[in-house]
Each structure stands twice: as C-alpha cells, then as structure tokens.
Amino acid sequence: MFTYNSRGELVGDQLRPGGRFGYQYDNIGNRKEAFEFGSTTDYETDELNRYAGIVRNGGEAFTPQYDADGNQTLVKTSTGIWEVTYNAENRPVKFESEDGGTTVECAYDSMGRRFEKKVTVGGTTGFHARYLYRDYLQVAECDLTGETPEVVRSYIWDPSEPEATRVLSMTRWEANGTQEKEHLYCMDDAMKNVTSLFGEARGRRALYEYRPYGGLITSEGNMGEENGFRFSSEYMDGELGLVYHSVHRYQFV
C-alpha cells in the first residue's frame, strides 16, 4: 500500500509485514531521509540541489562529486563506489571501480542509444556486447567476446504501447543466432516491472521483487541474473547496480 503527501511524493509503502518503507523530502522535493527494512539513510543537499552527503545508519558519510555540467562523477551503488567519465554530450562512457580492478565502458550512437558495453576485470574482458534497436527499444544483443559477433538474445515488446512499453518475451540463441535455444516469457505488474520469467517447459525461471524506487529485494531462479530487463522494463547493469534508461540515461537505485 502506497502513501503520498499533499505534493504527490511517496512517503510510505507497506510491502509486507516487516517490509515498511518511508521517505521524507524538503520543500522542493529533495529526499531528506529514507527508511527501508529498518535501515535509515540521511541526505544532505547543496545550494544547487545536488546531494552533498549521504549517511547510512549513522555511519561514515559518502560525498558525491560532480563535474562542471552537474554530472555526478563519483557514485555509490549496491556494488561499490564508481568514478564516472562523461563524453561531450554528458553521457557516461566509463565507470571505474574504487580499487581500479573493474572498468565498464559504454558507446553511444548518434541517437544517444547505448549500442556497446564492455566490462574488464583485472585487465581481462569478461563481457562485451553490442545492442541492436528498433527506435529506442532494444531488440537484440550480440556477444563480441569471440572472433565474430554472435546473436545471443532477442526481445519482443508490447506493440500496443509503442513508446512507454514493456518487454513480453526473450529468445536465447545459439549457433551464431541461427538456432533457437529457448523462449522465455515475461510477467509484469501494472508499473511495467518484470516480476517473473517462465520457460516453455521448465516452469518459472526467475522471480523479482522491488523496492519503491527500483532496488531489488528478491532475485531468484537460474535466469534471475542473465535477464537484464527488470525494473520498469528497463535494462539492469548488474555490474554497476544501475538501471540504464535509453532516454533518461542512468537511474541510481
């Protein structure tokens, strides 16, 4: 059950017994406090309405950093602290972990769509993908780690909602995209969040539950990690703990 204040801001959510969420804001909508599963996070803002300090359960404060354009260049997510580099169009092109061991690089086309992502851990490329689009909907993913690109996944979207739509199914491919490995079908809620994946013969393959602003509470099943489309039917970058929005860039959860 969601509760809102007079300005339409979310102030409470009773997900389940013991699963209460609460939020407080200042007069212009900046979050001041978050209460989630018994944990309290306090936020401090600067004169430009940017978060200047974040303290969890009274511990050490994390201080975000920004460039001259207001892009956040030092971020803290569920996977750690990342230093972010942006291109001239203010799109994030490189994420480097605090210890320098992991680098995530992104490339964009002339329409601002991310068409490539490369993850390097300890100097070794562990993930390298190219994304294919129909307008702003990702319809296929190619693996670039081998000598030749191979189609590994394709997606079907709800045609009744051409813009703010939801993913309906995923096909996994093998033999360089010439043979279907399996079809997986998505179940979603009223907010377009993918809540589960089902196979044709093997039952439920993934189950997800979310916090009010997109953080994962539950991720179960042998396809729980491989499936990228989760909160709001947007792509989850598991390495970064961030949701990639094709139009709105990254949402910090």
Q: Predicted segment positions?
A:
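Short beta-turn/strand-loop junction motif enriched in small, turn-promoting residues
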Residues: 71, 80, 120-122, 172-175, ...
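Extracellular/periplasmic catalytic domains that process cell-envelope and extracellular macromolecules
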Residues: 125, 132, 148-149, 159-163, ...
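A short glycine-rich beta-turn/N-cap micro-motif
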Residues: 1-12, 19, 24-34, 45-53, ...
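A contiguous, low-structure linker/loop signature
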Residues: 136, 142-155
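Short loop/turn microsegments at loop-to-beta-strand junctions
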Residues: 1, 20-21, 39-41, 60-62, ...
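A motif-centric feature for acidic-aromatic and gly/ser/thr-rich catalytic loops and repeats
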Residues: 33, 37, 41-45, 174-247
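Asp/Glu-centered strand-loop micro-motifs enriched in Gly/Pro and often flanked by an aromatic residue
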Residues: 59, 76, 96-98, 120, ...
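Glycine-centered tight beta-turn/hairpin loop motif at sheet-sheet or coil-to-beta transitions
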Residues: 16-18, 36-38, 57-59, 77-79, ...
